[in-house]
Amino acid sequence: MTDVLAATDETMIAPTLAPTEALVADLAVASGEEITYSQSAGLIDRLARMGVSLAFTSYQSGCLYMLGASATHGPQLHISGVQKPMGLSIDAQGDLTLCAGVSVIRYQNVLRPGQQINHIFDACYMPRTIHTTGDLDGHDVGVDNRGRIIFVSSWFNCLTTISDRHSFEPVWLPPFISTLIDEDRCHLNGLAMEDGEPAYVTAVSRSDTVDGWRDRRDGGGVVVDVRTGEIVCDGLSMPHSPRMHNGELWVLNAGAGELVVVVRDGPGKGRFEPRVFCPGFLRGLALRDGFAFVGLSKPRYKRFEGLPLDERLAKTDSSPWCGVQVIDLATGGCVDWFRIDGPVAELYDLAVIPGFTCPMAISPGSPEAAALITHADRLES
């Protein structure tokens, strides 16, 4: 690679724009295990036919992953380092928003249509705005129809937005939380947007005491309507990643390894219907064109102690794994998959990136961020 950034109408050549090797090497050395990636034979072709790529996060490895394929260089897994990456979303403008440790980061694609990085990547997400929030334990994130970032603070049990002056500005508290306080009481985690507004959240319990949710992991989980404060579904095990798709509310019943749909026959509380079992603790869900992209994680302490997932895995004679499964919603079958083996055992969130088949992202504060310079086409008069 060249030491000088060069840009043409078609291609930008940038120095060391893929820190994958260094990140993977550090993880492997620290754990004493090799990291391996595998995928189903049809995954890359499926993404290409859909005109999309995948982004997913692992706070355990400190990595933002982007999976796609180049027409000339084949499948590509680009990995960029980020402090504790958690929830991510792609908004209507195509920008990527990420909750990451003590900050919320807005990435923008800096390439023009037809441009590529190093003849491979057709989108390059640069961290353009970094809001320092402090440690709020940010989880799911979305952007409303006014361009306002809305994210879940598990530590403060609320939906919040960024503030120019303060660490955060609270937006909404669940009705069972009595006060805004820095205690993770119910483990609020998931956020579903609908029509550009916060619509539903998931919580592990309705507990209103510090760490109360830990004793309610099996069966204490709820889905709450943000607009009314109603509990629309309960009895879940550590629910995560609520998402709206074609008028239906889908949720990952993580502690049972289930993709479920919430059914409401009228006003008031509904029920959840399991549609698919996946062998892992489920977090990260994106739905598109009749398919669900589901993130799977292995247990943190060898077993999913106290969760239905342990029994389900034993019953199906299955081992948990880390990766992404593509589920056909019409049949419930897993039609494609991507798997990670080795020291990376946990994912948090994933998103489908439409319109780009081989994206990459730049790590904040990295040499790559310093080297990749772009500018507007003309001076503003």
Label the predicted regions.
Residues 73-142, 286:
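Blade-loop segments of beta-propeller domains
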